[in-house]
């Protein structure tokens, strides 16, 4: 891992997130998504066609993780191919560093940014993950990070595998939407990690731990966020909690408590981690490497040498939790 002068790391961080850093408020603004067409058969919509699209994800990113887990749970990886960017961001953006020759085998590009520019030659923002490319053109056509999982659930339903879980039951959709919005807004360590003022940091810090307390109480009497079965709300929460356990506590300074200090949240996280589709796409070591070693993130720790911490000890993630007792149907998730 190469040495980075502190000013170099800070400059990379500032440049990467320049479109979101609000110098007036000291906060990080929500991302603006340029490629926001919906899937469907209407005019101007993206046709729902097997083997036409490629999901691009990066294992360190929580929003990427949501999309990948949802794709896997629903069996859509049979009809939508997957490309994976490396966890160490280049100054120009995400790169396909783990592929042979550093080139995505389908899109034939090294930088994800090239697919964004194919989608819009005037694009000047930050190329983000997850993103969906049309393999017939090589262009990014959809990058709404928060909504891609829901599109997979609703718009791609006819291609779900047999006995796929219902992650968005109609009778619970309002509740799921409200809880998912709460999770994305409040269980948001980035509000602290990317704060540019003490006031912004403190506001995010208080909000973060108040929200964790609320969910700790909720999970005392139910196995999953919405009851007996995993829904989209759980996917939103899980990817945030597992990163709190691995990195956020250290890297973003949300250190009032550890995840283990919340018995219900800790057991809940382990319960979900042990579920097929979650375990296999939660790449613990890559998540840790992303937040601690990616050049654009190293400023958060003053980690000029790109060193990697040894902890945490993740063996407990595989121990039994007993949370199935909270479910009316303990044998099914």
Segments predicted by a language model, with ranges:
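C-terminal alpha-helical interaction module
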Residues: 1-333
């Amino acid at each position: 891992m190469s040495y980075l002068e502190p000013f170099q790391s800070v400059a990379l961080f500032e440049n990467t997130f320049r479109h979101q850093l609000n110098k007036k408020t000291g906060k990080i603004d929500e991302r603006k998504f340029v490629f926001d067409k919906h899937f469907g058969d209407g005019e101007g919509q993206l046709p729902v066609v097997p083997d036409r699209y490629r999901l691009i994800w990066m294992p360190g990113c929580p929003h990427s993780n949501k999309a990948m887990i949802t794709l896997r749970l629903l069996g859509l990886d049979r009809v939508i191919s997957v490309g994976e960017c490396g966890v160490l961001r280049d100054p120009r953006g995400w790169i396909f560093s783990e592929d042979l020759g550093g080139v995505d085998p389908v899109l034939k590009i090294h930088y994800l940014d090239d697919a964004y520019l194919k989608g819009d030659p005037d694009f000047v923002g930050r190329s983000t993950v997850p993103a969906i490319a049309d393999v017939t053109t090589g262009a990014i056509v959809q990058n709404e990070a928060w909504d891609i999982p829901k599109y997979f659930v609703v718009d791609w339903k006819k291609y779900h595998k047999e006995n796929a879980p219902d992650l968005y039951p109609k009778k619970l959709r309002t509740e799921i939407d409200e809880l998912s919005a709460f999770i994305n807004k409040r269980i948001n360590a980035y509000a602290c990690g990317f704060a540019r003022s003490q006031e912004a940091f403190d506001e995010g810090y208080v909000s973060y731990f108040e929200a964790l307390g609320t969910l700790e109480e909720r999970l005392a009497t139910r196995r999953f966020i919405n009851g007996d079965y995993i829904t989209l709300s759980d996917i939103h929460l899980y990817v945030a909690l597992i990163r709190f356990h691995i990195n956020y506590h250290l890297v973003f300074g949300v250190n009032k408590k550890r995840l283990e200090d919340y018995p219900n949240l800790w057991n809940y996280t382990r319960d979900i981690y042990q579920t097929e589709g979650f375990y296999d796409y939660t790449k613990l070591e890559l998540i840790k490497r992303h937040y601690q070693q990616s050049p654009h993130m190293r400023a958060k720790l003053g980690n000029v040498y790109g060193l990697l911490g040894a902890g945490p000890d993740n063996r407990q993630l595989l121990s039994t939790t007993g949370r199935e007792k909270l479910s009316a149907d303990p044998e099914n998730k």
